[in-house]
Amino acid sequence: MISDKTKREILSPAGTYECFRAAINAGADAVYLGGSMFGARAFAGNFDNEELIKAIRTAHLYGRKVYLTVNTLLRNDELEKLVEYIRPYYEEGLDAVIVQDYGVFAILRDNFPGLDLHASTQMTITGKNGAQLLKKMGASRVVTARELSAEEIKDIHDNVDIEIESFVHGALCYCYSGQCLLSSMIGGRSGNRGRCAQPCRLTYSMNGIKDKYLLSPKDMCTIEAIPDILDAGVYSLKIEGRMKSPEYVAGVTYAYRKYVDMYLEKGRDGFKVDAHDIMQLMDLYNRGGFCKGYYYSHNDKNIMTFNRPNHQGIVVGTVKNGEILLSEEINAGDVLEFADGSEYTVPAGKKNGRFALPKGVIRNTQNGTSVYRTRNNTLLAEIREKYIDKDIKLGLKMNICLKEGERALLKVQSDDKAAIVYGGILEKSEKHPATRADVIKQLKKLGGTAFMCDDADITVEIDGTPFVPVKLLNDLRRSALTDIENEILSEGRRKLEVPDRRTGEYTQNTKTGIRKTEKMNMTVQVMNKEQLQAIISSVKAGMEGASAIDISRIYLSTELSGIDGAISMKSMVDEYNEHISDDNRRVEVYLAMPYIFRERTVRLFDKKSEDIRAAGFDGLLIRSPEELMYIKNNGMYELYGGRIIIDYNMYTYNKAAVDEYEHLGINGFTLSEELNAGQLKGLCRSVGKYSIGEYSIGKYSTGRYSDGDREIYLEKIAYGYLPLMVTAGCTLKYTSKDKPCGRAGVYYFTDRKGKKLAAINSCGYCYNLIFNSVPEYLLDKKEELKNMGVNAVRINFTIEKADEVEEIILTAGASIKDYTRGHYNRGVD
């Protein structure tokens, strides 16, 4: 919640130190950047230790802030490096860390007092329940999902006392951030590890549309929406672009600084957007034009650009008979692009009229086609001159006292900070006594510093005829500037007190021994009645010795069937259980919650709450932080006696994450899809009652909640078409002539290699699931997983027909030919 409505934060990106300087000079209040480890832009320039310390100092000199991105998922072995990585930045005064991993969050919270933690957009915070959970955990700020409307953001602001940060400009992902495995599963480069290869920006085909960029949204520009965004309660306006140039960072930062200040000073009546400013932003970077993101629409087709995935620039004219009829002025050094993709660099500028092209420049371009400028050379030069070639300066006042026979004294002051330094005793001058002009000349030599002052800012007091060497004045000036810098910076600096903890990684605990699983259970997820009926029939057949799989639990998904459909399916299992005399053969039924739990879905579950309670589900499979807080708030957690399993997409990459979830009341976990066999084994053996001894990170705590004496339930998906994307965008809607809303079902994409990716449009929740082209298959690794300590393996049925379900149940998938091992063998980068 915003306490001071006259202040808002412009938060700019920096992939390099030059970008950082550009952001500060252009008016950013804060800069977010990545260090040498654990950032979500592993291919940005990023900052080494020296540069990052320098950035923190520079920002604090100017009264700005630095936020460090640690917004990736960390494995157990990487946690050991985390505290020592953060420590020097914390001690220098780092303002906040942006975090995705729940384990990382807990470690930073418990080891770095006073360090603000910001919940990354990778945590998929889509409403007030998730924001409330993160505040309870200790977050000072949440970065909302890009898909939220201004109204939904306002609902968070009005109900949770926490700062809100939202993206306002730059690239949009087609998938909810934190829910994407497309790059991970296709090429082994995980977005959750900062290495996304952006296969979403490649061509796909569906619904008769061939080879278009069906998963590529336009860039977002919300300059015109600033009044509504600020009124919704957004405190920090975040600009995307840690892979962008310094000119881009400076130009976009300046524009948002200008219009945020305009609205705060003049209100709606005085808020007027200059079309020229929007044009300059288009010149800097746009993908097929701009959109306003999701602030005003849930999944408007205008968000998408099917024709190109990269910078389009602006239209500057049209082709006619080998010439360009200019609609915009062009400059020397501008780069023009024609319809066939060819480029031409302008040798000399021209304001209007016809621009003749050398013979052969235009090859296949037809008359009447548009010519785009993809580089505005003059604009880039202007930005560089204003914001990159020179740094902003802090005003400084100086007062120097030069008295014959006494020590020289220099006092400097900048805002409310001051420093006083002394020199040697001044002797009487025989030939060249000090003059005011001479003194001012030396004191004004502030080049290479953060300060500036005019003659009027320097007070010179001379008593007698002292001899004042130039060296003395220079030494006084340097010492005073060093002291006032330290005075300014000292407020943010801290000292980390290291607790006296036993060091080590894993040490054998003879009391509990290695985690073991006596029986490997089998669970199944279904999406419709046909799949469920096939399972029931197969399980019945198993009683007669035909089935290879004994089902202990069924998860009922609601993406296609809705809540009522899941309740109806629950009654089918109840009927089956009534005819089972052996309690050990009875099947538990868990309700699988949606992947995304936005306010419209919250209202739906509120409406169906009594029906859900009456249905008598045995537990819940939850898939978002929103749902975890929701079930705590409405009594469902107590209703099910804490029988809650979190799904793979809530990411338990490490022991510390398991510990943190356990503190929040969760002891059932679906293991990550991005850990290989060795990493899974290490994680399984580090958690719960059967953890191998006490696990700590060097001298630091993994979290205050780990007692090594818990029963932890671990489940691993062993078969299924894995969702690679969860999207607010509806590609079926974007590519259909009619409106497909309300017609939930399965449709298919084809990628450039001819592989088909199934997708489900879940109209009840208004999101899409896009699945891998082949299923993951690990059912033959069941014994291996059991020996790791996994309690159950799960079969995830999604798009399978009834006969396919029966085949997999009866043969343990032995007949499956085309499949993937996921990351079980190779892991991710």
PLM segments and residue spans:
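Long, basic N-terminal domains or extensions that often function
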Residues: S140
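Active-site pocket-lining/capping segments in soluble small-molecule metabolic enzymes
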Residues: I2-I125, V143-S236, M243-D829
